[in-house]
């Protein structure tokens, strides 16, 4: 089953210092029918304005992946980490037994990123942090694993049966991706237009995949997109 959701049907939150789309129930948005997709709990598409950000706040028992699309954010947390996350960087934070952190845009330009929350395979993990950098040219014509609990080389690790990919396809490029009938996946289009098993998905749109052995991803104009592959339960 493939469910397509248009860009206009995302929940939009404008807090002056932050403009964001919540793809699932989060913060000021709640829909009992849109809380999660399998082990995927959150996918937020966020812009933080210059010299703004998130103050110190806690998390626990969640794998949190940040994909920096443009700009930069400064991350500090209770493990002692203080790092700048630049465009092209991917970060995995294991909240585990409990972590506090802050994220602020200390630059003079807006920061645009995706934040993805996935339920971990086990409870009680020690909090940890991992960061990796990816060059945009590497996404052309292939699905590149950014974060993975399956041991993909070059990806940040996750304590979850999940993988997050990014790809940039030129017009007409097509690839088959094996999902598995016992898994779920979400395809989110960052720019361009594509089809998922023939269903059109525009910029800002998404396709939610359940109980499908495989999907065919085809770009029509050039397309930049991510795939989040998770256990269904």
Question: Predicted segment positions?
Answer:
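Jelly-roll (double-stranded beta-helix
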Residues: 1-233
């Amino acid at each position: 089953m493939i469910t397509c959701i248009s860009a206009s049907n995302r929940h939009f939150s404008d807090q002056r210092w932050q403009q964001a789309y919540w793809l699932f129930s989060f913060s000021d948005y709640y829909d009992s029918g849109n809380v999660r997709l399998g082990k995927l709990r959150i996918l937020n598409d966020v812009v933080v304005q210059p010299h703004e950000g998130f103050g110190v706040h806690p998390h626990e028992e969640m794998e949190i992946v940040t994909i920096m699309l443009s700009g930069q954010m400064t991350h500090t947390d209770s493990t002692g980490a203080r790092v700048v996350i630049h465009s092209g960087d991917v970060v995995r934070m294991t909240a585990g037994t409990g972590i506090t952190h802050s994220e602020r845009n200390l630059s003079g330009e807006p920061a645009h990123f995706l934040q993805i929350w996935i339920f971990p395979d086990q409870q009680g993990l020690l909090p940890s942090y991992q960061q990796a950098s990816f060059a945009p040219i590497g996404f052309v014509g292939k699905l590149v694993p950014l974060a993975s609990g399956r041991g993909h080389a070059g990806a940040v690790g996750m304590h979850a049966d999940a993988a997050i990919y990014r790809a940039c396809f030129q017009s007409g490029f097509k690839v088959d991706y094996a999902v598995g009938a016992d898994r779920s996946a979400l395809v989110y289009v960052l720019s361009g237009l594509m089809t998922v098993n023939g269903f059109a998905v525009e910029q800002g749109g998404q396709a939610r995949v359940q109980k499908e052995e495989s999907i065919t991803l085809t770009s029509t104009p050039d397309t930049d997109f991510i795939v989040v592959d998770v256990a269904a339960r």
